[in-house]
């Protein structure tokens, strides 16, 4: 007998439909699986055989052939266990084949017949809903994550025996209800450190506000103890809330990486990733035998904070260049090409020299050559992609001893950030541009118009500082953001001067 079961595999953060075909015929007793399979998929044969035996169902002494199509797609992972088991049971006549139509099945099977959770359920169920499948069968532990998708029925299963009884109407499949799985995505904002806790550093705070308002990359340079890390960790408090579309993209990435839990099945807040400087290029960009998202993809629609930037290996930092330009990570493997979104805001911090105290000659003992060698760890092409560089100085004593100084809270700053972003959304309505930092060079003259007086001012700055074309464009984008924060439709000279 012959049967077909629908399942899927995740490549990048998108789902690819897969058909599991099972054929049970007379012949030599053999259990064979074909279809461009990885080792873990081939191992499903023994897991399914043992699980069925422990559930009271022995495979017949016949030839069993399993084909996973299309054959040109490399299949990997353990999510094929349950669809293979169901396909075999249907071919044996234990499960009615008509119940498998328009049903997508995923799940790993343990030797005792338990259904174990898998990674990437959210993109799989999302694709199934788009393809207008009637229902999806997923492990119970993935049900809350899968239930975020509307327009499709869900069956949560615990054991293989439960699956068999459910298909034969001996029991009813468990369907998570809306109020159980929490379709409500509005959650209380997580407590983060507040900008009001920082005394002094008004110039750096202003730079952070500008950077967040226009999604500009930011580099802070200063001595140890100046507050670079402290300030960076408060940036999440002034980020605007994600839209539902953005949150769904981020949740898909975390689903593929296996970072979602039953208590946190929806990424409601913008990510803040802070990898250590010893991270490998693969850890930053993503990779592995089955390529998965790295830190720069986990920071999608959020902040990637690189502390001690000059301590990262040069080859690791150079990986950032392409994702910062194209806002996605592209990995080429023998099994195919993988693409992960990585539209993040880079915030970096570093010391001006190896000891950290340059140019304070009383404390810095580095030679000029040592300072230059230290700064050369950051390549010029990478620096060209950072819009704002700001110096953090040692906090003055008078700022430290002020009693209850009035400092702006993160909530107050966030209101101005949201207002500036709303102006950008109105300006870029109907285009694929979302932030001032994303304005293409060809459109700068349209969105960043300058008067004759301002052009003369910028010409003098261009010649005096020997700017490159890319640096000039960066100044215009930052000035456009400052003007938005000022509520001005036109870029004024003071905006250019601050930029």
What are these regions (language model features)?
Residues 1-219, 223-229, 332, 471-472, ...:
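Peripheral, non-AAA+ core regions of ATP-driven protein-machinery
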Residues 18-24, 284, 387-391:
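Short beta-strand elements
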Residues 112, 306-313, 356:
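Catalytic P-loop NTPase motifs of RecA-like helicase/translocase cores
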Residues 220-260, 326:
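Walker A/P-loop
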């Amino acid at each position: 007998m012959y049967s077909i079961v629908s399942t899927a595999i995740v490549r990048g953060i998108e789902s690819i439909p897969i058909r599991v075909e099972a054929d049970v015929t007379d012949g030599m007793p053999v259990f064979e699986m074909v279809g461009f399979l990885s080792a873990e998929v081939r191992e499903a044969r023994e897991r399914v055989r043992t699980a069925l035996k422990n559930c009271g169902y022995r495979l017949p002494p016949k030839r069993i052939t399993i084909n996973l199509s299309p054959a040109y797609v490399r299949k990997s992972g353990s999510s094929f266990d349950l669809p293979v088991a169901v396909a075999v049971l249907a071919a044996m006549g234990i499960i009615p084949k008509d119940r498998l139509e328009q049903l997508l099945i995923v799940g790993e099977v343990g030797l005792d017949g338990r259904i174990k959770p898998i990674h990437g359920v959210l993109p799989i169920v999302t694709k199934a809903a788009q393809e207008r499948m009637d229902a999806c069968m997923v492990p119970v532990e993935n049900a809350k994550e899968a239930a975020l998708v509307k327009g499709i029925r869900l069956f949560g299963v615990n054991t293989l025996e439960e699956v068999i009884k459910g298909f034969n109407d001996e029991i009813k499949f468990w369907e998570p209800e809306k109020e159980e799985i929490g379709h409500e995505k509005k959650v209380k904002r997580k407590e983060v450190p507040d900008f009001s806790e920082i005394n002094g550093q008004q110039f750096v705070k202003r730079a952070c506000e500008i950077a967040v308002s226009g999604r500009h990359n930011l580099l802070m340079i200063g001595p140890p103890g100046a507050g670079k890390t402290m300030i960076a960790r408060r940036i999440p408090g002034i980020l605007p809330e994600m839209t539902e579309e953005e949150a769904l993209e981020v949740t898909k990435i975390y689903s593929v990486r296996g970072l979602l839990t039953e208590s946190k099945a929806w990424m409601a807040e913008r990510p803040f990733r802070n990898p250590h400087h010893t991270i490998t290029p693969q850890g930053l960009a993503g990779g592995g035998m089955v390529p998965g998202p790295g830190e720069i993809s986990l920071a999608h629609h959020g902040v990637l904070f690189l502390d001690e930037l000059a301590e990262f290996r040069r080859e690791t930092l150079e990986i950032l260049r392409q994702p910062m330009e194209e806002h996605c990570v592209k990995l080429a493997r023998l099994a195919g090409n993988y693409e992960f979104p990585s539209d993040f805001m880079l915030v970096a911090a570093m010391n001006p020299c190896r000891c950290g105290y340059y140019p304070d000659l009383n404390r810095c003992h580095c030679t000029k050559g040592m300072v230059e060698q230290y700064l050369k760890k950051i390549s010029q092409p990478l620096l060209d992609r950072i819009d704002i560089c700001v110096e953090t100085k040692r906090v003055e004593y008078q700022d430290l001893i002020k009693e209850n100084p009035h400092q702006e809270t993160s909530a107050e700053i966030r209101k101005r950030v949201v207002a500036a972003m709303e102006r950008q959304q109105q300006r870029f309505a109907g285009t694929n541009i979302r932030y001032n930092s994303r304005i293409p060079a060809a459109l700068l003259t349209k969105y960043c118009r300058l008067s004759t007086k301002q052009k003369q001012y910028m010409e003098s700055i261009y010649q005096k500082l020997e700017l490159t074309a890319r640096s000039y464009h960066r100044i215009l984008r930052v000035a456009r953001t400052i003007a938005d924060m000022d509520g001005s439709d036109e870029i004024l000279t003071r905006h250019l001067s601050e930029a």
